[in-house]
Regions:
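Juxtamembrane helix-loop boundaries in multi-pass membrane proteins
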Residues: 2-14, 73-90
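N-terminal signal-anchor transmembrane alpha-helix
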Residues: 1-48, 52
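Hydrophobic alpha-helical membrane segments
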Residues: 53, 78-103, 119-125
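Alpha-helical transmembrane segments and their immediate juxtamembrane interface regions
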Residues: 114-143
């Protein structure tokens, strides 16, 4: 079991090269907006890679916290619940807006951006599962 957990924790490090990819597309989007010609295709790519990145980040070992801020959140019952509710709302917003956009849009580029929102929502859903595990593993009121 420990080897499997270590394998997935190691696999979670794929998130860091993906951050560079997301940053590349994000910069393209910002530059295109500054030029008053938004690059929707780059936005779609940024959303898709961000969703994949979030998915890989959830492969980390949930029995350990990554930093002091994370530890403070997951050890506190109130802060932990607030974090879980916030992530839940984001998941719903990304999934619902993506599905509505995908199903109601007639333009192909809108469908593509909506698909990117759906992928991000699915990645965030995995993050929510990991956050629930972190909360269960670290909360102080259950020791």
């Amino acid at each position: 079991m420990k080897n499997t957990r270590q394998f997935f924790h190691f696999l979670s490090y794929v998130q860091y090269p993906l951050m560079i990819v997301v940053l590349y597309y994000y910069v393209q989007v910002i530059i295109s907006i500054a030029n008053r010609d938004p690059d929707w295709s780059a936005l779609n790519s940024a959303l898709i890679f961000l969703g994949i990145l979030v998915g890989f980040s959830t492969l980390q070992d949930t029995t350990k916290t990554q930093n002091k801020i994370s530890r403070k959140i997951w050890e506190s019952p109130i802060k932990g619940r607030i974090a879980l509710w916030t992530i839940s709302v984001l998941v719903l917003l990304f999934l619902i807006s993506g599905l509505i956009g995908f199903l109601s849009s007639r333009e192909n580029i809108h469908k593509e951006v909506s698909f990117g929102l759906i992928v991000l929502g699915i990645g965030m859903l995995g993050m929510l599962k990991g956050a629930i595990e972190m909360f269960e593993n670290h909360r102080k009121d259950r020791e």
